[in-house]
C-alpha cells in the first residue's frame, strides 16, 4: 500500500496505523512504540507513507517503482498539477481523472480522499456533491464513500454515495481511541 499523506507527518500516520493494528490508544502506542511495532510489524511493513506533495507524473513513477495493490491519496486537492492558472474545480478534475485512468491502466485500487466543501461543512450534511470539486470526483469515480460526523461525537456515519456495480447503503459506526471504527 502506498499512502500519500499530504497533510500529516509520516510519524503521525505511522502511529495511527500502529493504533489501528494494536487496538491501543495514542498514549499507549507512544509510550511503548518499539515493543508495539515489533509485535505488529508484519501488519505494517507493506505500508509506504510519503508526505511530500508529488505531481501526477511523480505519483505514476512511484506506483511503477513500488507496484502497490492499493494507493491512498490524502487529499487530492493537495496534488500539484501542471496547469498554472487552474481553478479549484479544474485542478480536482485533472487529478481525479488522471488517478482514475492510472487505476484502470495499472490494475490497482486508488482511493482518493477529498475534504468537504465549506458550505456542506457548515450545514453538517454529506451527500455525493459535498466534496471539493465533487462533480469531477463523482464523474471519475466508480464508488464514492462518505464519512460523516462531528468531532464532539464518537458516532460516525459511513455512506456509499455512488456504486456503479452494487447497492448504496448507510451504516453507523463508533470511533474508538485506537482509530478503529466499530459498527453499532
Give, region by region, the residue ranges found by the protein language model.
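A structural motif corresponding to the C-terminal end of an alpha-helix
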Residues: 41-48, 99-110, 140-142
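C-terminal regions of RecA-like/P-loop NTPase motor modules
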Residues: 26-28, 57-71, 101-106, 118-184
Amino acid at each position: 500500500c502506498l499512502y500519500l499523506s499530504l497533510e500529516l507527518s509520516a510519524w503521525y500516520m505511522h502511529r495511527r496505523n500502529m493504533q489501528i493494528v494494536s487496538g491501543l490508544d495514542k498514549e499507549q502506542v507512544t509510550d511503548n512504540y518499539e515493543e508495539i511495532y515489533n509485535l505488529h510489524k508484519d501488519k505494517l511493513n507493506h505500508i509506504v507513507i510519503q508526505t511530500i506533495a508529488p505531481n501526477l507524473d511523480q505519483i505514476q513513477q512511484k506506483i511503477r517503482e513500488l507496484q502497490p495493490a492499493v494507493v491512498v491519496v490524502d487529499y487530492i486537492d493537495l496534488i500539484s498539477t501542471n496547469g498554472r492558472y487552474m481553478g479549484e474545480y479544474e485542478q480536482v478534475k485533472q487529478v481525479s481523472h488522471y488517478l482514475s485512468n492510472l487505476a484502470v491502466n495499472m490494475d490497482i485500487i486508488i482511493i482518493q480522499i477529498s475534504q468537504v466543501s465549506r458550505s456542506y461543512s457548515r450545514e453538517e450534511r454529506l451527500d455525493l456533491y459535498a466534496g471539493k470539486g465533487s462533480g469531477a470526483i463523482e464523474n471519475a469515480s466508480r464508488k464514492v464513500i462518505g464519512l460523516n460526523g462531528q468531532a464532539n461525537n464518537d458516532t460516525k456515519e459511513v455512506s456509499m454515495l455512488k456504486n456503479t456495480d452494487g447497492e448504496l447503503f448507510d451504516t453507523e459506526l463508533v470511533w474508538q481511541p485506537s482509530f478503529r471504527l466499530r459498527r453499532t
